[in-house]
Amino acid sequence: MSVTSRYREAWEGFWREAPGEPGAVFWDAEPALTAGLHLALFEPHMAAAGLPVVDIGCGNGTQTRFLADRFPRVLGVDLSAAALDHARRADAAGQVDFRQLDAGERSETEQLHAEVGDMNVYMRGVLHQCEPADRQPLLDGIATLLGERGRAFVVELSEAARPVLMGLARSPAGPPPKLAPVFAHGIAPAEVVDAAVDAYVASAGLAIVAAGELPLTTTEFAADGTRIELPSRWLVLAAA
């Protein structure tokens, strides 16, 4: 099933208004603090490291370009055309194949798999802010892209992140400047409980190969100058 038009328009609006400079978006932390840490956890579980890598929900492509420095073929896919405009402008070397794709739409993931074959998947912070009806189709789409040989690294805000975010949103001074646009566009982060994620994985015919906890680093800082980090959970997935 396709995502709702409201959800799609929320992300188009967000990325149309987002600044282009690095680190201007709340979750756009430098790869050394994000994809670099994730890759160290992911690579030991890649059964076929030579497969193409697809970054689902790539946004402006910061992490995707990092992956492209390390793997021979990398695709960045996103629901938002405006996000992909940012990503292509930042990819001066043309390292990444950026495409608009709804990963929860079965026909689109099947078409991509038919073209590319089995893939390794990287997805950071997408499921937790999806609308409820879109969550299972997203995991089903990942299963399609993985095929038999692929592995997925999925990192999502844990349920423990919600009170942290709500505390930031309700502070007397208002939410931090980089977090405010997320709420302003009607995007609701940290909406999925941990047990539900495991259920979506199982229903998609996937198995959890490895799992752990790691703070999701943001580009925003608290009033005391410390960087805001959100509790998150990572999973390595494979066909069951």
Predicted segments with their positions:
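A conserved beta-strand element that flanks and buttresses the S-adenosyl-L-methionine
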Residues: 122
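A short His-aromatic
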Residues: 128-130
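Class I (Rossmann-like) S-adenosyl-L-methionine-dependent methyltransferase catalytic domain
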Residues: 1-114, 132-137, 141, 150-240
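A glycine-rich helix->loop->beta "capping" turn
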Residues: 116-119
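Oxyanion-hole/transition-state-stabilizing segment in secreted/luminal serine hydrolases
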Residues: 125
